Amino acid sequence: MAAVAWAQDKAPPVEPETIPAAPAIVPYDDKLLRLAEVIGSVHYLRTLCKAPGGSEWRSDMQRLLDSETKDEPQRKEKLTAAFNHGYRAFASVYTDCTPSAIVAEERYRNEGATLATEITSRFGN
């Protein structure tokens, strides 16, 4: 009977703390964050102006997240926040499609193309 009492008094084993993995340091993250912000802006403006393929920008962002942040939730959060920031920045300024909204969309689309080219030419495989 003493052995049974001794087994019941024993504390459960202490599990070691799980330390989250440090986020990966990616040399092109700054440019990638800017690209995500630009994609969010272009997505909003193209949808606002009913431009062809307006919804494909969000799909492009999802593909970017899937390929770049597969097992990195912190990076995914940062890129998603950048996309949302770009979207909201123009949503707070433009509620109608105006000539300046069209010009802004074109400029941002060109910036996005430049960023994508820089990232892939410098860091692509």
At which residue positions do the language-model features occur?
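N-terminal secretory signal peptides
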Residues: Q8-R63, A113-N125
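N-terminal signal peptide c-region/cleavage motif recognized by signal peptidases
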Residues: A2-A7
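Compact alpha-helical subdomains of small soluble proteins
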Residues: G53-N125
